[in-house]
Curated annotation (Swiss-Prot):
NCBIfam families: PRK00029.1. Belongs to the SELO family. This is Protein nucleotidyltransferase YdiU. Keywords: ATP-binding, Magnesium, Manganese, Metal-binding, Nucleotide-binding, Nucleotidyltransferase, Transferase. Its EC number is 2.7.7.-, 2.7.7.108.
Length: 491
């Protein structure tokens, strides 16, 4: 790779320049023996980065933060947050760095961020490092979410550092290169608010408006418009999580983005057997972030954002509170509409028309199918794929999944009367998701040096709606001996 190719890597520093109070210049830890494990070539091209360069020795060092382009200044970002309901006034990037910003092929500004790049001033007791398994988990799941059409941060690369990292055992270290619309979080606003620097809070909000919701700038109250936009984005996002059976696992306020992108995939999972109380994270002992609790927790987080933004919504705090409460009230309406409309589409009964999804008959069918799923602990993803076969006249696969055939048959008769669109169902209900047992299989193999299962899984989940020969095992639930699934964040 030529020097000319390297010179095309230009990173901006807008966040650090406009919000220097939230940015601490810092250097990544040197990796002793780096090795590129996986590179997202299409994403690299979208960002104007040469995949060949990124695969070179210098390019790999760039992905680790060990080779910083001229003019770039990596920074650790400061933020606060509520973690499992407990407030921490200072969290920040303890093991991560914002390398800078890139403009993508559509003219959007995107953050290039490293995870596992070493201790920063925010590290507290942590070692600042990450290990191969959790970084590849984020790569797999974030790219699967993108393929599902769900707003998410993206994964550009995972690089093994060549350093062993102590967790319960000694494990191979790694760095994830992550791409996002920004890394602004609810916790960013909480940190700015706790400084009692209203001018900083205003600059942060202006930065968020400029990057994510420029239409808010023209509103009578731009900051209220920003808040309403974040509420709407999160209502849509969480509904999309619920519709595919995604459990985030750690919905702290520092893990909720202003952009409406899913971020931080540490202890995430997808439900197999439908269970509203599903919890996979080892640290969520009380079930705070269980599958069915996710909309409630998102609303709770947004209330914390409103508290942080009160000085911007109205200079008179007493006047600001009812305005913020009214704006937050939009979340339940918007989430309910997105969930009901999405479920109707999963049933092949609506092509996105709100009036169709809102029909009482359709809503009754939505309620009925969730009852069938729950009562029989039915595989959530496979059920809807097989239901599309029933829409085409073959009900044997789906009937073979349910416990109460009489209840299903009564429900299905009413559903069939509405002439469900099987093609719409196939375009809406994925055949392939990152099933927990397949993710663990890929991570275990990769930790041992075998990347083939990882690449096969990525092949499946990168085109989730199109069934292909040879990928049948990727549509199936976990084997009986897989046992109870528990995830760990890897810190």
């Amino acid at each position: 790779m030529t020097a000319a190719a390297e010179s095309t890597v230009a990173l901006g520093g807008r966040f650090a320049r406009e919000l220097n109070e939230l940015a601490v210049p810092w250097e990544a830890e040197e990796a002793p023996d780096p090795k590129l494990l996986v590179l997202n070539g299409p994403l690299a091209a979208e960002l104007g980065l040469d995949p060949e360069y990124l695969s070179s020795e210098e390019g790999v060092r760039f992905l680790l933060g060990n080779h910083v382009p001229d003019g770039a200044t990596p920074v650790a970002q400061a933020y606060a947050g509520h973690q499992f309901g407990g407030y921490s006034p200072l969290l920040g990037d303890g093991r991560a760095l914002l390398l800078g910003e890139l403009q993508d092929s559509r003219g959007r500004l995107r953050d290039l961020h490293l995870k596992g790049s070493g201790r920063t001033p925010f590290a507290r007791a942590g070692d600042g490092r990450a290990v191969v398994g959790p970084m590849l988990r984020e790569y797999i799941v974030s790219e699967a979410m993108h393929a599902l059409g769900i707003p998410t941060t993206r994964s550009l690369a995972v690089v093994a550092t060549g350093r062993q990292v102590r967790r319960d055992d000694m494990l191979p270290g790694a760095v994830l290169a992550r791409v996002a619309g920004s890394h602004l979080r609810v916790g960013s606003f909480q940190y700015a608010r706790v400084t009692e620097n209203t001018e900083l809070l205003r600059r942060l909000a202006d930065h968020a408006i400029s990057r994510h919701y420029p239409e808010a700038a023209a509103a009578e109250n731009p900051y209220l418009a920003l808040y309403r936009a974040v509420v709407a984005a999160q209502a849509s996002l969480v509904a999309q999580w619920m519709l595919v059976g995604f459990v985030h696992g750690v919905m702290n306020t520092d893990n909720m983005t202003i952009s409406g992108e899913t971020i931080d995939y540490g202890p995430c999972a997808f439900i197999d057997a439908f269970n509203p109380a599903a919890v996979y994270s080892s640290i969520d002992v009380g079930g705070r972030y269980a599958y069915a609790n996710q909309p409630v927790m998102a609303e709770w987080n947004l209330a914390r954002l409103a508290e942080a933004m009160l000085p911007l919504i109205d200079e008179d705090q007493e006047a600001a509170v009812p305005v913020a409460v009214e704006a937050l009230g939009g979340f339940r309406r918007q989430y309910s509409a997105a969930w009901s409309g999405g479920m109707a589409t999963k049933l092949g009964l609506a092509a996105g028309e709100p009036e169709a999804a809102a029909g009482a008959e359709v809503q009754d069918l939505v309620d009925g199918v969730t009852g069938i799923l729950k009562d029989g602990s039915v595989d959530y993803t496979l059920f809807f794929r097989n239901l599309a076969k029933a829409a085409r006249g073959d009900s044997r696969p789906v009937r073979g999944m349910v416990m109460d055939l009489a209840a299903y048959d009564a429900w299905a008769e009413r559903w069939q009367d509405l002439a469900p669109d099987a093609g719409l169902m196939d375009r809406t209900n994925p055949a392939y998701i990152p099933r927990n047992h397949l993710v663990e299989e890929a991570l275990a193999a990769a930790t041992g040096g075998d990347l083939d299962p990882l690449h096969r899984l990525l092949e499946a989940v990168s085109a989730p709606y199109s069934e292909r020969p040879g990928l049948e095992r990727y549509t199936q639930g976990a084997p009986e001996d897989f046992g109870t699934y528990m995830t760990f964040c890897g810190t």
